[in-house]
Amino acid sequence: MCGILAVLGCSDDSQAKRVRVLELSRRLKHRGPDWSGLDHHGDCYLAHQRLAIIDPASGDQPLYNEDKTIIVTVNGEIYNHEELRKGLPGHTFRTGSDCEVIAHLYEEHGESFIHMLDGIFSFVLLDSRNNSFVAARDAIGVTPLYIGWGLDGSVWISSEMKGLNDDCEHFKFFPPGHLYSSKEGSFKRWYNPPWFSEVIPSVPFDPLALRKAFEDAVIKRLMTDVPFGVLLSGGLDSSLVASVTARYLEGTKAAELWGTQLHSFCVGLEGSPDLKAAKEVANFLGTIHHEFHFTVQDGIDAIEDVIYHVETYDVTTIRASTPMFLMSRKIKSLGVKMVISGEGSDEIFGGYLYFHKAPNKEELHLETCHKIKALHQYDCLRANKATSAWGLEARVPFLDKEFVNVAMSIDPEWKMIKPDIGRIEKWILRRAFDDEENPYLPKHILYRQKEQFSDGVGYSWIDGLKAHSALHVTDKMMLNAAHIYPHNTPTTKEAYYYRMIFERFFPQIDSPWRSKCGLQHSKSY
């Protein structure tokens, strides 16, 4: 993943302002350590920190149309860029970057081109012909994006909060599936599939159709010009990602460049459930498996860095982000720049254990809709920022736009958990990949019950975090919690500890994590 920063409609075009924009952009350098770029046009600055995955040699940003009147800075991957290029025969491309197509599509189709993109993205596009700009974020919010406003009337857009919190009067999450137009001065939703209205779907479950949709999602994400691998915890989701990747790797450009044997990566405390399960799956699939160990103290020592990079004080997110953060550093040290990961399945298929309590299919469907809509604040945040902290890109096929649309169109009766007839959580996903003749996974892995990521890496991890937090937060401090933190008041010592660290890094009163911006924290146990 790359990092983008844009300052638009800025009243100050001095050299000092340019230096300041560069300084703020460097705060995102971990996201894109391969190249830094800046375009200054009139009262607008577009900065970019590049992680080179596609066309490393010539794809530096910002990117332009032929006469450089359209300027764009992008964080993302456009998986159908080759097909889109074929539909632009009159255009000349300067690079092989998948993102350059955005500038030419806008020139040809205006803002409506966004519906043509198949991928994940956050971008800011400046049209210097009329000094207007548009900014947009992908359907689910896989790529992070924030928008802020300055006292001078400027609009600021950044991949991370740390690019905005010192210079903006107010900032918030840029909503997923939306486009912001300076001409209108407002957001409009571009992603509005049938499931988004929360109407109960009625399409019968077709195992082969669901399998095909997921395989297509994984195959798209094999688009890379750099070494890659898969994150493998040994649970259902990551194991399916690894299995499909291994099955379809041969014959791809990635295989031609880096070989047909897939690399897999797992992290855990010594003796943790994930390490054991991941090794079994890796042996079954024949991957080159890399196992990383960490201690509870290693994780505790990394907490401040995790909160700084992931930019949250949500307890569950921090617990799960820390092992991922540590693993990402190890993976990057091996020369790998991209991994494929399994986030999103639990939200789509009702995989969390509390879904056992769903009273009917209507309530289950509504809850899955709400969980998917909130993903950008939790698992997407973790998967993107815990990896990007080390210049590693994570791709998440379960959150492929087309796959989500297929999975969310299925009658939710099929997602209901019914132990009496053998339907455990995510039964339809398991059933879709239950192939007797050419198995994707061993049966006991395919039907392994879900564990929380932070439990799977080792049961003592959470206990260690709670004990460490108790050393820093007293009972007396907890009595004043509602006065010190009136918004999203921490109710446990662990939550209070994370909040103290967060406030030290991001002290601005108006941050996206305030309740007025709609955040509801996930439950932790």
From Swiss-Prot:
It comes from the Eukaryota. One of its GO terms (molecular function) is asparagine synthase (glutamine-hydrolyzing) activity. It is an enzyme of class 6 (ligase). InterPro entries: Asn_synth_AEB, Asn_synthase, Asn_Synthetase, AsnB_N, GATase_2_dom, Ntn_hydrolases_N, Rossmann-like_a/b/a_fold. Residues 2-185 form the Glutamine amidotransferase type-2 domain. CDD domains: Asn_synthase_B_C, AsnB. Its EC number is 6.3.5.4. ATP binds at residues 231, 267, 341-342. Pfam families: Asn_synthase (PF00733), GATase_7 (PF13537). Keywords: Amino-acid biosynthesis, Asparagine biosynthesis, ATP-binding, Glutamine amidotransferase, Ligase, Nucleotide-binding. The active site is at 2 (for gatase activity). Residues 193-517 form the Asparagine synthetase domain. Pathway: Amino-acid biosynthesis; L-asparagine biosynthesis; L-asparagine from L-aspartate (L-Gln route): step 1/1. The keyword ATP-binding applies. It catalyses: L-aspartate + L-glutamine + ATP + H2O = L-asparagine + L-glutamate + AMP + diphosphate + H(+). Disulfide bonds: none annotated. SUPFAM superfamilies: Adenine nucleotide alpha hydrolases-like, N-terminal nucleophile aminohydrolases (Ntn hydrolases). One of its GO terms (cellular component) is cytosol. The record marks 343 as: Important for beta-aspartyl-AMP intermediate formation. GO terms for biological process: L-asparagine biosynthetic process. Could play a role in remobilization of nitrogen in flowers during senescence. NCBIfam families: PRK09431.1 (NF006949). This is Asparagine synthetase [glutamine-hydrolyzing]. It comes from Sandersonia aurantiaca (Christmas-bells). The gene is AND1.
